[in-house]
Amino acid sequence: MKISVLTLFPEVFEMYLSQTILQRAIELGKMEYDIVNIRDYARNKHNQMDDMPFGGGAGMVLKPEAYWNYFQENFDFYGKENLNEEDLDGENNHEIGNENEDFKSENSKFKKPHVIFVTPQGKTLDHQKVMELAKKEELVIISGRYEGLDERVLEKFVDEEISIGDYVLSSGDLPSLVLLDSISRIKEGVIKKESFETDSFYNGILGFPQYTRPVEIDGYEVPEVLRSGNHAKIDEFRYKKAIEKTIKNRKDLFEKKILEDEKFKKEYEKLFYGKSK
């Protein structure tokens, strides 16, 4: 799988890619990353990437030309024509945005990446979406900045907009790293299967509490059952604690799980109330 990130600050990604689980994914041949300085694709005198918004307003908006050039130079699906600032001026904006529609529909053999724009206006990322994205052959993540990205880029190239939460950051670089990490770690072999299967959200609920040495600190002890060696009791304890944590911290997840998973509902009733049908 290949993931490309279009950013104005590629150096943000360098250390993370070289020292984390993402590096392991590279070494195992599970992932390929391309961190692109999108400014390199600008076609103006000073490689300017931002400009004032039409209609007025605070802040600056990322210009569209560099994104057009990136996609058309790197993917046959979009054609090869480079654009400069003048190409997007005047009354021909619509034509430029749609000029390759026939080309795309008639040439499906040309690869098309799945393109994501990370933005607080997108749908909130969850484990199910990460699993879905991990099945794609190639992703391109657009990392925004300033007040936003020219809407024509979204209309032309972006397949979906994704948010990592209902708050605003200075740029899309951190959300892009979140996507890189969350997708890479579930690729087969990158982490142990046992670790992946005990992650929060894997089974629709949060993960169970973890403990390590020492057994006691300042009066707080590791639960005795975890030291018993009885694996059946340990599994039951962990499952119950995971449910309790989900009810406490993410009641929405618990209620969804109860409604959609009859087996889980019966297990919950038996574990907490001794009911068995």
Q: Where are each of the predicted segments found?
A:
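Fold-independent oxyanion-binding glycine-rich loops
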Residues: 8, 38, 118-121, 143-145, ...
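Internal, active-site/partner-interface "lid" segment
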Residues: 186-225
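S-adenosyl-L-methionine/SAH cofactor-binding core of RNA-modifying enzymes
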Residues: 63-139, 145, 188
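N-terminal nucleotide/polyanion-binding subdomain common to many enzyme families
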Residues: 1-75, 227, 233-252
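Short, well-ordered secondary-structure micro-motifs
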Residues: 127-129, 152-154, 209
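SAM-dependent methyltransferases
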Residues: 215-277
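Hydrophobic/aromatic beta-strand patches that form the interior of the parallel beta-sheet core
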Residues: 4-6, 34-36, 116, 139-140, ...
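Structured adenosyl-cofactor binding patch, chiefly the S-adenosyl-L-methionine
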Residues: 149, 153-192, 196
